[in-house]
Amino acid sequence: MKFFIAIFLVFSVLFSSDDYELPEEFDKQTYEVGENIFEQKCTSCHVKFIDMNKVVRNFFHEDNKMNLKAPTANQISFRLKQQIGDKSDIEFHLYETADYLKSYVLAPDRSKSICLEGVIKYFNGMPSMRGVVTEEEIESLNHFLYFLEGFNGINEYFHDETLF
């Protein structure tokens, strides 16, 4: 009996669901550069992370009781992947989301927002970041935002996007 328990434990460890493989498109250095850009140039309005369940409750049940001035980075990460382009090819999807982000960050327009109307109604319009961030910085920022949510193993902010 102990033999079978030992075999079970070995296989449980070898084939546990904690094993993952990061997408080959993930670049740690670009992610960290984008994260630094976010922290330096975006956090005056955007919070980096709030649990998605709390975010949903805040906007749809508590009338923005948290007084957020702008979507959180993890909200943007989630919506970016859901609303822009074809997510079946991560490499191409990164180009699509970067193009969108450049367009929006440099010339914001509510009609181009990826956020739900029930969320953006709480925010003033985003100011243009033209002259504040370069297109190259936006590409790094896009890499950070793209991989912030939904990819286990990159950071502590993973959640199961299929639940939303």
Regions found by a protein language model. Name each.
Residues 16-38, 50-55:
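Electrostatic cytochrome c docking/interface patches
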Residues 34, 38-49, 141-145:
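The canonical Cys-X-X-Cys-His
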Residues 39, 88, 111-164:
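Flexible coil segments in periplasmic/lumen-exposed cytochrome c-class electron-transfer proteins
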Residues 62-128, 132:
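Extracytoplasmic electron-transfer domains, predominantly the class I c-type cytochrome c fold
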Residues 1-28, 146-164:
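N-terminal export/targeting leaders of redox proteins
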